[in-house]
Structures are given as C-alpha cells and as structure tokens.
Amino acid sequence: MENPRCPRRPLAEKKARSLDRPQAPGKGSESWDCHWLSLPTAPSRKALHWTTSDWARHSDSPAPSAEAHCTTAAAPTPEETGDFLPSEQRPSQDTKKGWLKTMLNFFVRTGPEEPREKASRRPRGKEGISQHPEPLEAAGEPALRKKAHHDKKPSRKKQGHKKHAAEVTKAAQDQEARGREEGLSKAAAALRSGEADLGPARRGGEDSDHQSFLIKVDGTGALDVSPHATGHQQEEELKKPDQDAIIQMIVELLKRVGDQWEEEQSLASQLGVALPNPAPAVRKKSQEKKTSLKRTSKTNPKKHGSEEAKRGAADVSSPEAWPPKKSSFLPLCVSGHRPSISSSYGLEEPKVQEAPSTEAGAPGPSVLPTPSESQEPGEELPLDRASEYKEFIQKIISMLQDAEEQQGEEQPQVQQEEVGVENPAPHCRRKSQEKRSSFRRAFYHKKHTSKEPRRAGAAGAASPEARRPKRPSFLPLCVGGHRPSTSSSLDPEDLECREPLPAEGEPVVISEAPSQARGHTPEGAPQLSGACESKEIIIQKLVALLQEVDGQLGQQIRRHPSFKRFFYEFSDSSLSKLVATLRSQVAHSSKLDRNRARRLYQFDVSLANKFAGSNSHAMCILMGLRDHYNCTQFPYREDQPNITSPKVESPD
C-alpha cells in the first residue's frame, strides 16, 4: 500500500535528487528526514516547483512526456515564483520551505484543506487511503502526486479531462498559497510583537529583524522551538507567580479588614452596654427636681411652686433629706371627693413627723410626750397600727365631708324658704326651684374658693412681710367634691398652726411653722401663741366629741395619741366645721335617745283633746309632747265652759 506521506516518485525525480545529494545536509536517503531549517522573518510568496526546463536538463528521457506537460501546467507562473535560486540549491530549499509552512500551519492552526470537488472526484476504491488530509505536505507535492496519479491511470482519463483537473488543482493551489501567506504574515507579526515586548535585555541584545526561528525535526516528529517561543513561555511562567502573590495579598487584606470590623463591632457592643448604666447622682437629682417643679406648677400656685423649687435646690446638696420630701410634691385633689394625701401615710409619715429636726427652732404644739410618741425614726410601725391609721384618716375625712355637705345644704334651704314665703309659687315651680338649689349647692364651694385667693392677694399686697406665712391659704379646696384639700407637704417643716377664719371670710393667718421633737420636755419649749392655743383647744374639743360620737375612734385615739397630729394638717375653718357637725350629731343623738324613751308613754292626741278637758295642757307637758306638738291647738279656752255641761260624760 502506498504511504500518503511518502508517495512513489518517478525515476527522473530520483535521479535529480541524487545529483543534489552531496550538497544537502541530509542524514538519510531522502532529504526531508531531519534538517536544520532557517526562516527569514519577512514572508515570501515564492513557490518552489520544478519547471519544464529543469525536468529536461536533469532527466535522461529523450522528450518530455504528458507527465511533464501536466507538471508544467500545474506549476505557477513566473510572476508568482519570482527569481529562482540556482538549481543545486532548489531541492533543499523546497524541502525547507515546505517544512516551514507545515510548522507554521501547525502553530497557526490553519492546515491545508483539499477542495470538495477534488475529494468528490476521487475513486471509491482509494477513499480509505486518501480520505485523511495531509498536513505535512510540501509545496511541490501536489504536482508530483498528480503526476503519479496520472501514471497509474493513463487509460481511464482522456486529455480533456486531464486539462480540466489541472485547472482545478491550480485554483486550489492558489487558494492554499493565499491562506498560507496570510498565516505567515500573522505569525511574523506575532513574533515581532513578542520581541518588542521582551526588549533588548531579555533577548540578549539580538536584533529582532535578523533573529531566526529554528526548528529541529527528528524522525519521530519531535520539535524544538527557538528561544522566542521559550521566552514567551518563561514570561507566562513569571507572570503566574505574580498573580498568585496578588491574590494572596488580596486575601490577607480581606482578613485584616474582617478582623478590624470584628474589633469595631465588639467595641460598639461594649459601649452600647455601658451607655444604659445609671447616671450620676447629681444628674438624677436634677431630673427629680424638674419633675417636682412640673408637678407643683400644675397643682399649686406660682408662689408655692417657687418656694418648693428653692427648697428642692437646697436639698440637692443634702441627699439624705431628699427621700422624705418626695411625698410633698403629690398633686392636690382637684375633682375628687377626698383630699390628696400621701400614699404612705400609715407607714412613713408618722416616722417623719416623729423625727427630731433641730434645724427649725420654731415652737410646736404642746402635746405631752408618750412612750408611743418617743419612738426612734428607724422603727417600723406594725401593720395593724398602719391599717388603723388609714381607717382613722378615712373616717375623719368622711366626717368632714358630711359636715361640709350639711353646711352647704343649710344655707340654700334658708334662702329657699325665705323666697317661698314672700312669693308663693305653684307645685311645679317649686320643683324647678329645688333643681336650681341643687345646682347652687354644687357651685357654692367653687365660688367661695375663688373669692378667697383674690381677697388674700389684695390683703397681702399691702404687707409684703405677711405673704410668706399666708402661703398655705392659697391651697385650693377640693373643687369637684365637698372635702377640704389637705396640705400636700407632710414634712415636719410644713406642720403649721393656723388661726380660725374671721367672720368676713378673709384667709387664714398662719403663724410660724412648728417643728419640735416629741421627746423634748415642755419645760424648755417657748410659750405658745394665741393661734396655736386656739387650734389646740379646737383639737381637744374635737377629740372629746369624737370619743362621744364614735367609740371606736375614741379608742383608737386613746391607744395611739399620735393620731392627733393628723388634725394639724387641716385648717381652722375645717376643724371648726367638724366640731360643729359633731356637736349637732351629739345633740341629735341625745334628742333621739330622749324621744325613744318618751315614745313608750305616748298615746293618741285625739284622746287628750276628747277627755282631758281643762287638763290637756298639763297632759301635753307631762307626756313630753311640747317639742313635737303645739299646745295651742288644744281648745283649752273654748272647751272650758263645755266641761260643766251635763251632756259631756267623763270616762270615769
């Protein structure tokens, strides 16, 4: 079988090659087994083929045959080939350039391709041999293979068919030459650009225009590329570690940034935990001072608020005095029915009142010290005493409310009776008057409380020195209810003696604030003023009346005399109202007791009118009916002559 890479050559070609064999540097019988090739950098379009004259000179045949004619037809024109070298060098140069083109095609990946027409015209019997392309085919091989093909089949083809095939092969060769020329130009440009990138230092000072591209071809087909290709590979190998180093640096930078971010997050979390820590004591006190000022400005008048603010500012320096004064800023009762008192009356306030305060030297009320009063401030009251104290306060407040309601009802009733006597009205009009009177009762206290601060302000403008002791008189009464509002400050400094209200309704004149230790002896205490004496007398009367009216309250006061101090929180007018109410209750209870005792002996009054006769007046006196029935209704004078008449029969 014929080898596609080594086709059978004619005898004339072998003789021509034998003449040039001493000049070629080949090792074997054929010149293309192993050669050292040198390619100039500039591309060339010279196609080295054997012409007709060369065949005639080197061959021993007498005349050129049809094969020479076909070879001549397949050879390129002189314009394409250009100047030819001497005939002695042509075989070696042909093989060199053929190998060079095949290697360039191998690098550029543009191998020679046969046209489809030529492949389709091949006989079917030899498709298995020639179906693979021949990438390592030399430039002169198509013509030689064409000649051998015509030698084998001279009888099958005619001359016209040979001419047509020669034209087709010529066109295919031209196309292949153009493609190879373009590939060579691209390869040369790539080599020049690579040499320009390497520079004179890496290429060893050699000129890029005269640098050769050496290829060593062994019989096995191994290739050894020149230093330019190795330089590109070394450059790529040098660039790769740089990229790895850059990637490693980026990774390290990211690690550093991540560590820094974690540290910042940890610091931020620590700061966030440290921020909600409690503020300093000074800041807390300033905040409490602001809240206390807001409360006093809403509930109390401006003057009272300014004094409390001054007191609060003074207490900031002494933190020990701050907690007991917290309760003094509780708001007053504005619309309720009970005065605003501290929620810690039963537990904390008795201790605060019993605590000795040596700073205030004002005299206090003359209350004899008792063992229960001389307790230490650190002792805690038992729960039963605290509950009793709360019950006592509630009862006193309810009694005071009843007293004010009774007093408020009496005056409108008197006015209504006077109007009813002067102008008698029908029953429906009386009902409307009763409704109006109920409205008058509701707004009665509101009118009086609004008048009192005005009068107090007018009276205090003339005497500025008296404004300070008149401070508690500005505290309004419970507007919506019927109970007086107690002082919101329950400290020992605010316990003051008050004088009773004058007849014309002027505000109470308050003396100096008493604050004296309960354990002190009354001998060393200064003499009390008339206002304090009058208030103490009122309190004593009130205690006595409470013992008479309600035995439970009397027992509580006897067991715990310290409960009397609660009465010092009320004004004199409130205490006087409470005393009057208790007196009326005592009188009413005594009358009820007498009536109950007398009702056992009561009988029908008509019987007295019928049978008593002249003794009816005496009967009324004896039976105790003088208070409830008017004795003038008995017809004493008119019935006296009828007694002697014989028609009247005595019950006897």
UniProtKB/Swiss-Prot annotation:
Record PANTHER family: CHROMOSOME 6 OPEN READING FRAME 222 (PTHR22435), PROTEIN BNIP5 (PTHR22435:SF0)
Ranges of Basic and acidic residues composition bias in the record: 10-20, 111-129, 173-184, 233-243, 304-313, 382-393
Disulfide-bond pairs as recorded: none
Originating organism: Homo sapiens
Protein name, entry field: Protein BNIP5
UniProt KW keywords: Isopeptide bond, Ubl conjugation
Covalent cross-link (Glycyl lysine isopeptide (Lys-Gly) (interchain with G-Cter in SUMO2)), residues: K302
Keyword Ubl conjugation: yes
Pfam families hit by this protein: CF222 (PF15661)
Region (Disordered): 1-34, 53-243, 259-494
Gene expressing this chain: BNIP5
InterPro entries: BNIP5
Top-level taxon of origin: Eukaryota
Residue spans of biased composition, Low complexity class: 63-79, 409-422
